[in-house]
Amino acid sequence: MEVKVSWNGPSGMSFRAETGSGHMVVMDGAPDGGGNNLAPRPMEMVLVGTGGCTAYDVVLILKRGREDVRGCDVLLQAERADTDPKVFTKINFHFTVTGRNLKQAAVERAVNLSHDKYCSASIMLAKTAEITHSFEIVEV
């Protein structure tokens, strides 16, 4: 896996990243750090990637289990250390899984498998942060 990150220049603290799969992402800093607040912060992108990783797992596991999943949202709420390097210390993942006749046990299994076995991003973050997760099922 490869990503190239480039600073956009001396007028701020924005960066563009090109992924190995050919996609572009822009990041920016807070105004108090010289940024213009025009894009997500790099640490927000860590949460974005982690949320995408675990939501992907949950949907895939449910689909493979032939569950009629129609939607999956995950809200990540995180706390960071007060001192540098300001790592994440707590992250809560709350899943809202939408579908028809979804089994509670199947959703719980999918969430647990993602966090315990498959989502490399959340497993890495668990080395420094207390990870908790919850879910709700919405019938459609």
Regions found by a protein language model. Give the residues of each.
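Extended beta-strand/beta-hairpin segments
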Residues: 1-48, 59-140
